[in-house]
């Protein structure tokens, strides 16, 4: 395993903001023909603190970072596969616009419901609900960054 990582390279330090460096390494490994071995006994966790309303501005900021780093990923691997991974397709753009009713469901309109869910012990449900506008924000940011960079 060490030899394979040395051959394809470690995490790319060009990913200096949040997002995609792990999947980009995986894409390089996949392209060299490394076989995926599933190990159901292996467990991994992504720990996130319970959602609070104070976290929302940072979560929105992270979506902008993910958009910028998504383009770093796409420039390295300009494939349809990577477009789908980073949600850089018109299908994704349409999906998140529809699911948020064109932005009517957003971090502001959801705030009372999010507050209620958090107050009543459902911060996880609140976070899942907040993912709708966050995904819309992220996909819009990705398309905006791509336009500024001259990518389509």
Where are these regions (language model features)?
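Non-membrane alpha-helical structural segments and their capping/turn regions in soluble enzymes
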Residues: 20, 57-68
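Short, well-ordered alpha-helical packing segments
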Residues: 27-30, 64, 71
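Non-catalytic, C-terminal membrane-associated alpha-helical segments of glycosyltransferases
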Residues: 61-65, 82-152
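A short, conserved alpha-helix in the catalytic core of glycosyltransferases
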Residues: 3-9, 14-43
């Amino acid at each position: 395993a060490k030899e394979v990582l040395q051959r394809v390279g470690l995490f790319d330090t060009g990913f200096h903001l949040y997002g995609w460096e792990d999947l980009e390494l995986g894409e390089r490994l996949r392209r060299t023909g490394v076989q995926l071995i599933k190990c159901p006994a292996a467990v991994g966790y992504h720990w996130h603190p319970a959602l609070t309303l104070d976290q929302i501005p940072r979560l929105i900021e992270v979506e902008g970072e993910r958009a910028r780093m998504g383009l770093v990923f796409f420039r390295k691997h300009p494939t349809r596969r990577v477009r789908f991974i980073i949600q850089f397709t018109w299908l994704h753009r349409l999906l998140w616009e529809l699911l948020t009713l064109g932005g009517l469901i957003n971090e502001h309109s959801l705030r009372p419901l999010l507050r209620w869910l958090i107050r009543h012990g459902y911060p996880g449900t609140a976070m899942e609900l907040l993912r709708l506008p966050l995904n819309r924000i992220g996909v819009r940011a990705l398309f905006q960054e791509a336009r500024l960079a001259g990518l389509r």
